[in-house]
Amino acid sequence: MLKLILMMIFISPICFMQGLFWMVHNLLFVITFVLILMNFCLNYFVNISYFMGFDVLSYGLILLSFWICSLMIVASESVNKYNNYKNLFLFNVLMLLIFLVLTFSSMNLFMFYLFFESSLIPTLFLILGWGYQPERLQAGVYLLFYTLLVSLPLLVGIFYLYKNCNTMNFYLLSNYMFNCNLLYLAMILAFLVKMPMFLVHLWLPKAHVEAPVSGSMILAGIMLKLGGYGLLAVFSFLQLIGLKYNYIWVSISLIGGVLISLVCLRQTDLKALIAYSSVAHMGIVLGGLMTLSYWGLSGSYTLMIGHGLCSSGLFCLANITYERLGSRSLLINKGLLNFMPSMTLWWFLLSVCNMAAPPSLNLLGEISLLNSIVSWSWLTMISLSFLSFFSAAYTLYLYAYSQHGKIFSGVYSFSGGNIREYFLLFLHWFPLNLLILKSEVCLFWI
């Protein structure tokens, strides 16, 4: 476990050397493949060193973190080209990656909290330092306040646990069962905001719209998964009270998912549309996770990984067209089929993955989640059917409006993609569709 952390710490001086922008990216890819070869597909903690260890859940999410972070560097070519504080940018991405890996590999609840909150700081720097509009300050404040306001109860809850159990180790805490309402609320609220659950999701579209492409990728790809991972961690000792109160969160997230899907249908901003679709997807993840059934837990993990790759890829696409046209508005991003014919294929592939068409990992996750939520209560079928329908509707809206229609009169030339962009999109789409062939890694980890 320490070897990965040390490898990343030793990459940090390379960030500040001239002309080694791609070297950092290559080294991150090397670490990713080292991690794949280590292959911890075990349902208990392995590779334990002090407070860090791996289980299957954290293994998949750490792998996703490495993958997305190395792709962030590929996507942020403009930072390199215009020399926009690129050394600082690389260092920021690396620090974020280190915090994420430490978060996912913590076995101690307090260490988990510490790194969970620390990962907010580099993200904030990304948004404030490399964002596009002046409104990024407002987005940063939203992000910070939503997250920090609810993380204080989490800290108090962790100290309460420590006072009662004399331990903060996940493995030992799972022997206890707590039935305290306030503790339940305190432990769970921070993760609901991070997911984000409907009603506390307002920071997400703001942060996404103002963030640079790398910020959007890391937010959609990993940050939302921290909430899901945290919930999976704390429910090991909150099962009893969870079964009593979870219906509240399931109802909010399913009804919220439908409402957010309707909001999606009237967005004119590409990034905002993709951001709201993330909220809808995480709503169904939250619903499945809260049923606490086998299908629900494995499906939520599968959809988290699938959504991380898919949503990140869509943000890359939105950024590619933004770099060419200088706008994210759907009123200007019209008729892209004429403007960038070769990118239309990628728009199509990632859009259908977003609406959970086979053979994507999202399909597998959504089927498991539908299974778990419907078996939990028959009434949920109503909102689930709406959710599935509108999910397809807004994805088709995104695809059809951007690719078809009359080309905007201000666009005067055609534009091809370059190899870097195809490579980037391929590396989002390929694992997404390949993993369905090795789905036992995602489904049979409990």
Swiss-Prot record:
Q: Does the keyword Mitochondrion apply?
A: yes
Q: Where are the transmembrane segments?
A: 4-24, 28-48, 56-76, 88-105, 109-131, 141-161, 182-202, 218-238, 245-265, 272-292, 297-317, 330-350, 373-393, 426-446
Give the main localization category.
mitochondrion
Reaction catalysed by this enzyme:
a ubiquinone + NADH + 5 H(+)(in) = a ubiquinol + NAD(+) + 4 H(+)(out)
What's the protein's topology in the membrane? Multi-pass membrane protein
| Listed GO MF terms | NADH dehydrogenase (ubiquinone) activity; ubiquinone binding
Q: Which InterPro entries match?
A: NADH4_N, NADH_UbQ_OxRdtase, ND/Mrp_TM
> Mind listing the GO biological process terms from this record?
ATP synthesis coupled electron transport; electron transport coupled proton transport
Q: What is its EC number?
A: 7.1.1.2
Q: Which family does it belong to?
A: Belongs to the complex I subunit 4 family.
Q: Indicate what this protein is called per its UniProt record.
A: NADH-ubiquinone oxidoreductase chain 4
Q: Which organism is it from?
A: Ceratitis capitata
Gene that produces this protein: ND4
